[in-house]
Amino acid sequence: LVDSHVHINEPGRTEWEGFNTATQAAAAGGITALVDMPLNCIPVTTTKAAFAEKLAAVDDKLWVDRGFWGGVIPQNIADLDDLLNAGVLGVKSFLIDSGIAEFPNVAAKDIRAAMPILAKHDVPYLIHAELDCGGFNHAVINEKYNSFLASRPKKWENDAIALMVEMARESKAKGDDC
């Protein structure tokens, strides 16, 4: 059983969670492999050097198999070949603010530049599919889940999916929303 969407946060933010505890918990729950997301760690996994640092951080801390997603941000398009050749399984981007300053969201021009590289490597492109199309959403989030849902207009997701379908058709790259 593989959990392909895990934020382990190591190196750099082990007070949130590190590989030792995350993989022990996974093993206790019957998970045999985790695939770590590229953000919430320091540095974010957007370059070959950052990926090497991530690999060094997991040494002797794994209780299950592991894999890693790299990240696509506006500043690393030229580094994608090296990152993919280093062994990440694919890449992830946000179309909206990720909440992490070191992992800014991409625009259509960044996606358009990245997708041919991803197609060449035949790897998936995971997209956080919310596209803020302007206008501020004034919904108040409280302890009710429905209040969170109200803060995320359906149009944001619909527009993001439409953009990614268009980009995937243009480039023949694989895409997925997450």
Residues covered by each model-derived region:
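Histidine/acidic residue-rich metal-binding segments in metalloenzymes
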Residues: 78-93, 98-178
